[in-house]
Amino acid sequence: LKAKGYTTCHTGKWHLNGFFNDPRHPQPNDHGYDWWLATQNNASPHHINPKNFVRNGKAVGVIEGASAVIAAQEAAHWLRKERDKDKPFFITVWTHEPHLPIESAPEFMKPYADIDDEGIRQHHGNITQLDHAFGLLMKELDEQGLAEDTFVFFTSDNGPEGAGTKGRTRGSTGGLRGRKRWSHEGGIRVPGIARWPGHIKPGSINSDLVSNLDFAQTFLELAGVDSPPDMQGLSLVPLLAGKTPADWRTSLFDQYCEFPGPDGVRRHMGVRDSLYKLMHFYNLDEWVLYGLERDPREMHSVYG
């Protein structure tokens, strides 16, 4: 993108190295970002008034407010004041919310005042906190007259964190089985919402199999840049236009290989198509097979 003339900005979470803001590992600027405000992994001590943000290599200390809002406001500031307005732009905003440890500002918890469980109020407030932050960025695009010529994509990296039975770990998988680290639908089926005025039909829904491996090729095609031959994904541009290629993928593979690990999830791999999912817990040599049309919650294995 830089070679194509793009100016770039990243705000929020940066979980792509072991030594953050340290020359031993690449930092956001080493990955092509002109401007960045980020933390490694989680906001510390939590989402409210975080103290571990770094801007362009310099620690900034405590910032008052919610981390998602801070990230969105920084991106909006960059759009207004810092970017080269003669160049096209690329922004990534990776929020901490609603990753644990969850903490929500009181104003975002108010809509849930009738819920007795304070932890659930915190969780729901965290989603509202994120929604508010995303809205700030969309408003900035509108105010600068950029909305009609900007592609926006909202997604997540995995299903909800934690056990999910109560309080701040509640999360929501829409009734689907599994959470983060699982190959069950609740762990891998995540939001994917795109806005591209004049190209995407408002309210349209696509059910083809896609992966986060597809994002880079999509953004490169939109920018008119050829993808490197070793990239493994597929551009989503034809799907966004409602024109699924005849040779689009018919299956997806994933693997979780850490154990013992969080939540006691066993090592496993999974492959699915539009009708079935096969999972292998290879340390136990246990197989399960689910028919996703009849059993979308994956409650009854038909293996064997």
Which role fits each region the language model picked out?
Residues 88, 94, 129-168:
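Metal-dependent active-site segment of extracytoplasmic phospho-/sulfohydrolases and closely related
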Residues 4, 29, 67, 71, ...:
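Stable alpha-helical elements in mature extracytoplasmic
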Residues 1, 13, 134, 152-154, ...:
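Structural scaffold positions in well-ordered secondary structure
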Residues 22, 26-35, 40, 160-185, ...:
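C-terminal cap/loop subdomain of S1 sulfatases and analogous C-terminal strand-loop tails that border
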Residues 13-15, 96, 159, 199:
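Catalytic metal-binding/acid-base residues of hydrolase active sites
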Residues 2-6, 15-91, 95-113, 121-124, ...:
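Formylglycine-dependent
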Residues 2, 34-37, 76-80, 124, ...:
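Non-transmembrane alpha-helical segments in soluble domains
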